Design a protein with these regions (language model features):
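Canonical Radical SAM [4Fe-4S] cluster-binding loop centered on the CxxxCxxC motif
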Residues: 1-24
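Conserved, mostly hydrophobic/aromatic
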Residues: 2, 28, 46, 100
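Hydrophobic residues within beta-strands of alpha/beta enzymes
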Residues: 10, 42-46, 98, 171
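Structured mid-domain segments that build the active-site/substrate or prosthetic-cofactor binding neighborhood
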Residues: 12, 21, 25-29, 34, ...
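Short Fe-S-cluster ligation motifs
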Residues: 30-49
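Active-site-adjacent beta->alpha loops and helix N-cap segments on the catalytic face
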Residues: 52-58
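A structural motif corresponding to the C-terminal lobe/cap of the Radical SAM core domain
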Residues: 64-71, 75-255
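Radical SAM enzyme core and accessory elements
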Residues: 209-372
Length: 372
């Protein structure tokens, strides 16, 4: 099923999509471990229509706590909740790729689709995933009711920029089809459609032929989109004017050539610390060496060791934080919250605020201290 279940083009009228039932994390981990034991396979594809960020966070923590080593991928929505730190946590648990619907890369059409996302948001989430080493496949759509050729060309230009920036590695253009169980199919007149048939013939035969009062997508658009995508995936033609992919005349894209750069500049600070987040440490055990009033904190990393020198009380506080945030199966209680971290800091609130802006803190964050 799908926890969002609002997209107007999707068959959300069907029970198997609209009735989302989340599997408890403990039960899911048990199923994974059982399948590993039965098949000796450690690659998993989670087939939810869209997996909620909170559920994936819980799954990732459980996999790491129990040291269940798998490679996995699944379907998501480009939700703001997929922060850079959450994406790093997912990658640490074995996530190698995600698929998600961008559909039409047009904010006007995304509103009409009730996707609940924006094109800028999509770029930022894709960037967080890619920085964590997770591959991104985007579902794309053209020919949505009321979509203009200009909007289609603008969408293709945004997709081109996403590929240029390596924010998306794979994608596919689907032509819009009204279906019998979608909000559009259930109320076609409200969307400017006239259904031509056929009569409903069951679950597997639910595509509806239709006409839109403003006309249909011109012939040749689909072929140009298909042609462009085949080349983009191979890294070809990314510097070309997107109009060159079409055999028919198309308008000049109105999208700024620096759209992705500007969208990413508006990113919030890397998982900006807020009171309801918790600190999780995905690195190895820290070691502190005291040197008079100062101390050197060492933390092992995947490739190289990270070391920071701090006043001894701060080094001990940070070492305690990393120990408390370590992922381990015998853990009792929750991981330290941001409020608890701030209260335990050996200094004033102003000193704490200053400390988390220092390079030493950023180095520890980069080494594996996550706020999720």
């Amino acid at each position: 099923g799908c926890y969002w279940k609002q997209c107007t083009f999707c068959d959300v009228g069907l029970d198997y999509i609209s009735r989302y039932e989340i599997t408890p994390t403990k039960h899911l981990i048990g199923q994974i471990e059982r399948l590993i034991g039965e098949t000796d396979r450690r690659t998993f594809h989670f087939v939810d229509e869209a997996a909620p960020p909170a559920a994936l966070k819980s799954l990732a923590i459980a996999l790491l706590e129990r040291e269940v080593r798998i490679s996995w991928w699944g379907n998501i929505r480009f939700e703001k909740a997929f922060t850079p730190d959450l994406c790093r946590l997912l990658a640490a648990s074995g996530c190698i790729a995600v698929t998600a619907g961008l559909e039409a890369a047009s904010d006007r059409l995304l509103v009409k689709m009730k996707k609940g996302i924006t094109v800028d948001q999509t770029a930022r989430v894709a960037a967080a995933l890619r920085e964590a080493g997770i591959l991104v496949h985007a579902y794309l759509m053209y020919g949505f009711p009321s979509e203009t050729v200009q909007e289609t060309i603008d969408s293709l230009e945004r997709v081109r920029q996403l590929f240029c920036a390596d924010l998306v590695q794979s994608a596919f253009w689907h032509r819009f089809t009204a279906t019998a169980h979608s909000p559009i199919g259930l109320d076609p007149q409200a969307n400017g459609l006239r259904i031509l048939g056929p009569d409903f013939q069951g679950f597997a035969e639910n595509d509806l032929s239709h006409l839109h009062r403003k006309g249909q997508t011109p012939e040749g658009i689909g072929e140009g989109l298909r042609r462009s995508m085949l080349n983009f995936i191979e890294g070809r033609g990314l510097s070309m004017d997107v109009r060159a992919w079409f055999d028919i005349n198309t308008p000049r894209p109105r999208v700024s050539s620096t759209w992705t750069n500007r969208a990413l500049q508006k990113r919030r600070s890397d998982d900006a610390a807020v009171a309801d987040r918790h600190c999780i440490w995905i690195g190895g055990p820290p070691v502190v060496q005291t040197q008079g009033k100062r101390a050197r904190l060492y933390v092992p990393g995947g490739i190289k060791e990270t070391a920071v020198t701090l006043p001894a009380p701060q080094a001990m506080w940070l070492s305690d934080l990393l120990q408390e945030g370590r992922l381990r199966s015998e853990r009792e209680g929750s991981y330290p919250s941001w409020r608890e971290v701030r209260r335990a800091f050996p200094g004033s609130t102003a000193e704490f605020t200053s400390f988390v802006k220092q390079p030493s803190w950023e180095r520890i964050r980069a080494a594996g201290l996550l706020l999720v």
